[in-house]
Swiss-Prot record:
Location, primary (coarse class): plastid
GO cellular component: chloroplast thylakoid; photosystem I; plastid thylakoid membrane
Membrane topology: Peripheral membrane protein
Name of the protein in question: Photosystem I iron-sulfur center
GO biological process terms, semicolon-separated: photosynthetic electron transport in photosystem I
NCBIfam families attached to this UniProt entry: PS_I_psaC
Note on cofactor: Binds 2 [4Fe-4S] clusters. Cluster 2 is most probably the spectroscopically characterized electron acceptor FA and cluster 1 is most probably FB.
Source lineage: Eukaryota, Viridiplantae, Streptophyta, Embryophyta, Tracheophyta
Amino acid sequence: MSHFVKIYDTCIGCTQCVRACPTDVLEMIPWDRCKAKQIASAPRTEDCVGCKRCESACPTDFLSVRVYLGRETTRSMGLAY
């Protein structure tokens, strides 16, 4: 099943989500709009197993990384198939 991983611009570049991911879905990329000058990116979403460890590791008040699982993706994102 395919999962959607969304990185929000509230990311502070701490790398906690990248280190928490057991399948190496996330990586940090350069980004000038935060103090750390980097932001999480999800280039390998096909490897996401939906464990949501990245969400649990995120220290921001509003989770900067969210994983939407299968049917949850269509409801949360307002999409219809």
